[in-house]
Amino acid sequence: MRVEELASVHNDDSHAPPHTLEDATVLQIVPALREEPIARTVLDVASALVQSGARALVAAEEGPLVGELTAFGGEWAPLVNATVNPFRLRRSARTLERLIASEHVDVVHAQSIGGAWIARMAATRIPVRLVTTLLDVPPSGLRGYWAGALARGDWVITPSNFAAAPVMARHKIPIERVTVIPRSIDVAAFDPAAVDAARVEAVQDAWRIMQTARILLVPGRVAPWNGQLILPDVARLLLDSGVRGFVFVLAGEHRSYRKYARAVAKEAEVKGVQAFIRFAGHCRDMPAAFAAADTVVVPAIEAPVFGRAVAQAQAMGRPVVTSDVGVLPEHVAAPPEMPEEVRTGWVAKAGDAGELAHALGEAFALDETAYRTMSERARHFAEYMFSPRSAVAATHAVYGALLARPLADSGERVGSAAKRAEGR
């Protein structure tokens, strides 16, 4: 149901501020309820809220997921927030303020730049706890200015330390107001138990690779920022060290950046490693592609937006060798940040063929028992770090921590807003 249809039921003066999440009303703000990762996460959080006894509202422009939201007991409120037009933002802020008051909203969680501005403006006029979620990659310039609203919540959720560090420094956010919750992946689809042998064989047949070859899967578009140009050097170093029987499979679209793809092929020819590098093109069955691989290689030289390939590979129980840019190192359990006994992969310096080859040499050196153990660790690590269930639980913990505080202690903004509300 739309929130307006329920306003008469919930709009009374008997509302007492809750101290637990089960008694709370939580309003999440996203641009639109379309099938995209952020909206899917919002629905996961809302569904769990309803199951716990809380009331879950989502303010967004209409989309195909509205029906799914209302089917499990969530409520939708129309709200334009995918804008930085100041006039539309002010109008939406007034709409949000009325919604917070009429529905007795306890926590507002803004997950877009426009939504954060709207929530911030509304929260200066009515007391409410405000949670914001940072973007995956820290923006700069004018977009960085607008994105600053995402740093002004009473509690800030960030998908990574990489995303949080510059924002925390710029806006002087204390660490106790920040929680890292990695973006979730579909750990049910990316599950070794869900991929049968026929799917794996189909992928291998499409790649025209012998089943005895050690497949080093390089997922992602063949593009400059993904760093595939280093692979011929890595292949040559491996061959010179006596390693044989491997092939790099570049599983990603390679026509958008033809010049770069040709440069990779030319470098392979110059190094004499053409037979060890295969351009496989776009793969429609990535779980099967990961299952076919022995090791997954992510040689990016620029920070990726999400870094999902590293998470998906580990969910499929595959060791990962990745570069040290952006969020990628945070998505692998590897020394020195983690003990050797919990290792799920290796992190190499971006653009360093020697480090990448050395890491792959260590991966090749694993015996069957050690490989199986690392594979199991990788799967468990992915379930803990990247499952939707983990993301929901961590988000609910943030809501619960805020609700446990007196509203006036949620920040200077909320405290002053509460005083203004009392004086009206």
Each predicted region: which residue ranges?
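A conserved mid-protein helix/loop that constitutes part of the nucleotide-sugar donor-binding site
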Residues: 36-44, 214, 221-237, 262, ...
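A short, well-ordered alpha-helix in the C-terminal region of glycosyltransferases
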Residues: 362, 369-385, 394-397
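A conserved, positively charged/aromatic
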Residues: 124, 130-161
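Conserved acidic donor-binding segment of nucleotide-sugar-dependent glycosyltransferases
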Residues: 334-353, 363-368
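Nucleotide-activated donor-binding/catalytic signature segment of Leloir-type glycosyltransferases, i.e.
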Residues: 261-281
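Short hydrophobic beta-strand element within catalytic cores of glycosyltransferases
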Residues: 58, 319-322, 327-332, 339
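Carbohydrate-associated surface elements
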Residues: 162, 184
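Short His-centered aromatic/hydrophobic patch
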Residues: 110-116
